[in-house]
Design a protein with these regions (language model features):
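Short loop/turn motifs that connect adjacent beta-strands in outer-membrane beta-barrel proteins
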Residues: 34-46, 58-59, 87-100, 148-171, ...
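Hydrophobic, lipid-facing positions within transmembrane beta-strands of outer-membrane proteins
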Residues: 44, 78-84, 137-143, 172, ...
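Transmembrane beta-barrel strands of outer-membrane/channel proteins
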Residues: 50-56, 102-106, 174-178, 235-239, ...
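Residue-level signature of outer-membrane beta-barrel architecture
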Residues: 88-92, 145-147, 178, 225-228, ...
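Surface-exposed coil loops of outer-membrane beta-barrel proteins
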Residues: 116-133, 137, 152-264, 313, ...
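Outer-membrane beta-barrel "beta-signal"
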Residues: 140-152, 384, 453-465
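Signature for the C-terminal beta-barrel architecture of outer-membrane proteins
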Residues: 201-331, 338-341, 345-352, 359, ...
């Protein structure tokens, strides 16, 4: 399947006319243009996407390397991912709609240094276990249920996870099945889409949110959502992996689970001018509590210092459920017809093992994007953001003493925050075909000021079918 999708990607631009658009170009569509029409009136939903990312970096300063280091020699890698989205409206009652959703996906290629050595890795599409191969798999299978609490309806954008084009203004929604939690939580219209926006996974998702997921980023979960005009509350209960960054899930929820609560207000703060308050904006606050068989950094350091282990090993502990918790905050605001800004903050307690997403205990990000409509390119976009990531003292000491995480481990650590600047230009070539040019500057890769800095260049081709 993946090879067929990628062949169509490469074939598509050959049939297009010049990408030049004059000042009289039409306004952007409600959603990104696609290769084929997606009729909103149909009971079925059928779409697809393919994303090909080429990344490279030149040699950079590095007095030493460990098993989990970003390689200091120059390297280049290509990742590929293709998805087929399907859905069917089982019940079309406006107040009590029911959808069945099935998505098939295939991922191939590699990440730089096998996606090791960076807390904020440069490519969200990379699977962190290359031995899984590129065999297609069922990424999502879920049921979506709407329970209307009013007869007043509001227009809604059709998505692969919600097929309705209108929904009750006050409603409950439920999703049950296999999904990725960032499909529904911690969304941000400026920086959550590695297909058309930023590539770095500590920008596209809150890096300190150690959300329940297997290696591919999916879990079995139940999500409940309450919406009332410009306010939404969400709760998610999800299965954790059996081991850190593992492909298998633990279904004994008494032993392991991920619980998440999010509150969202789609209204500009009162400190804004009246003009800004009338533009689109949102504030989201997220809290999570994970239970799993996670190691304790301080305990492993003490065992090493007592001479009981040759190096600190976060996985070498008696099986026992432990708890990890954290909070996240993200804010976005439209400031003009074409310009938007956002900020993001995340924190977790950091004492226990980074388990499912990445090795970040605190993150702060700020950036924005600008649509090039004024330049006759209504579907082109430029974006830039800065993110700074950190880990707690016990995590720092663990890495300094030679401990390995599932992503990091230089064999030593001269600690500093990992700082990243990313900028991209996304060029709309024809219908659903896009090319992006992306640059990422990374200071202190893997929190190590002895190494780097490093510049990562990327070219992305994306097709929406």
């Amino acid at each position: 399947m993946l090879k067929s999708i990628l062949f169509l990607c490469l074939l598509a631009p050959a049939t297009c006319t010049s990408g030049a658009q004059d000042a009289a170009a039409p306004a952007p569509e409600a959603g990104p243009p696609a290769m084929f029409p997606h009729p909103g009136a149909a009971r079925y939903f059928f779409a697809g996407q393919a994303n090909i990312i080429f990344q490279a970096h030149a040699p950079f300063h590095s007095p030493y390397e460990g098993p989990n280091s970003l390689l200091s020699r120059g390297e280049y890698k290509t990742s590929m991912i293709g998805t087929i989205y399907t859905g069917f409206e089982l019940v079309r009652n406006p107040r009590y709609a029911t959808d069945a959703i099935f998505d098939v996906e295939a991922a191939g290629g590699r990440g730089l240094s096998e996606a090791l050595g960076l807390a904020g890795f440069t490519n969200l599409d990379v699977v962190r276990n290359p031995s899984l191969g590129s065999t297609p798999y069922l990424a999502r299978y879920e049921v979506h249920q709407v329970v209307g609490l009013t007869d007043t309806m509001a227009e809604s954008e059709r998505t692969p996870y919600s097929l309705e084009t209108s929904l009750p203004q006050r409603r409950l929604e439920f999703w049950v099945g296999r999904m990725s939690l960032p499909d529904l939580l911690d969304l941000n219209s400026i920086g959550t889409d590695s297909h058309l926006q930023f590539l770095n996974w500590s920008i596209d998702n809150n890096g300190a949110w150690d959300y329940a997921a297997n290696t591919r980023g999916y879990t079995d979960a139940a999500v409940a959502e309450y919406t009332d005009h410009d306010f939404t509350a969400r709760y998610a209960l999800a299965a954790m992996p059996t081991v850190a960054n593992g492909i298998d899930l633990e279904y004994n929820l008494k032993q392991a689970s991920g619980q998440n609560v999010e509150l969202e207000l789609r209204r500009g703060p009162g400190i804004f001018t009246q003009a800004l308050r009338q533009r689109k904006g949102a504030v989201r606050v997220l809290g999570f509590v994970n239970h799993a068989d996670m190691g304790d950094y301080r305990e492993q350091i003490q065992l090493f210092l007592k001479g009981l282990t040759p190096t600190p090993d976060i996985t070498a502990h008696a099986p026992k459920p432990t708890m990890k918790y954290g909070v996240g905050w993200n804010f976005e605001q439209e400031i003009s017809e074409n310009g938007r800004v956002y900020t993001q903050f995340g924190w977790n307690e950091g004492q226990h093992e980074s388990y499912a997403y990445t090795e970040i205990d605190q993150t702060i990000a700020a950036g924005g994007d600008y649509a090039m409509k004024a330049f006759g390119r209504p579907n082109d976009k430029f974006g830039i953001t800065f993110v700074t990531n950190a880990i707690k003292r016990d995590h720092q000491e663990y890495l300094k003493l030679g401990g390995m995480g599932f992503l990091l481990g230089d064999g030593n650590l001269n600690y500093a925050r990992e700082d990243i600047v990313e900028a991209y230009y996304n060029y709309h070539a024809w219908k659903g075909v896009y090319y992006a040019f992306d640059e990422q500057f990374i200071a202190h890769p893997g929190y190590n000021q002895d190494r780097g800095s490093v510049m990562v260049e990327s070219v992305r081709m994306h097709v929406d079918f």
